[in-house]
């Protein structure tokens, strides 16, 4: 446990240092931009003492500077002592709104819905997500994300399972390209 605390403390220190030394970039996404992000983090099943390692890969397209439509592929892997490890993959389209308060820190809120599957079952999943994109250069950002996922076999069951989902937090690096940026000379 002590090693894990040291790891988290080091990661938090590195993240804070990265944010503090980063040169603010004038790089807010514009309509027509594409975005790709790779992220890793942790997944915690609500009401349990277990968690899992999480890896995300996502692609998004900015419909406007605010609205982004995309798809996320995620893999949650649970390492179990004295038992079989387990995994759950999710494929979820998402729609988020990016708030442009300035050009280098872009918070967002959104929804995702799709399927969750493993080697035994396929179910539906949906939930809210939120986070912030901190631009480190014109086209590169640090992404901090949180999402809640709940699962259902039918839409009638979705309401009953709202408090039996997963909390997923990730940190990743993303790239934005394309779009119609105005150039200044």
Residue positions per predicted region:
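Bacterial N-terminal signal peptides that target proteins for export
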Residues: 2-12
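Bacterial N-terminal signal peptides
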Residues: 11-21
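Short glycine/proline- and aromatic-enriched beta-strand/turn motifs that initiate or cap beta-hairpins
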Residues: 23-63, 68-69, 73-77, 166-185
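Flexible, solvent-exposed coil segments and beta strand-coil junctions
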Residues: 33-38, 106-112, 152
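Gram-negative (and chloroplast) outer-membrane scaffold detector with strong preference
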Residues: 58-129, 134-140, 177
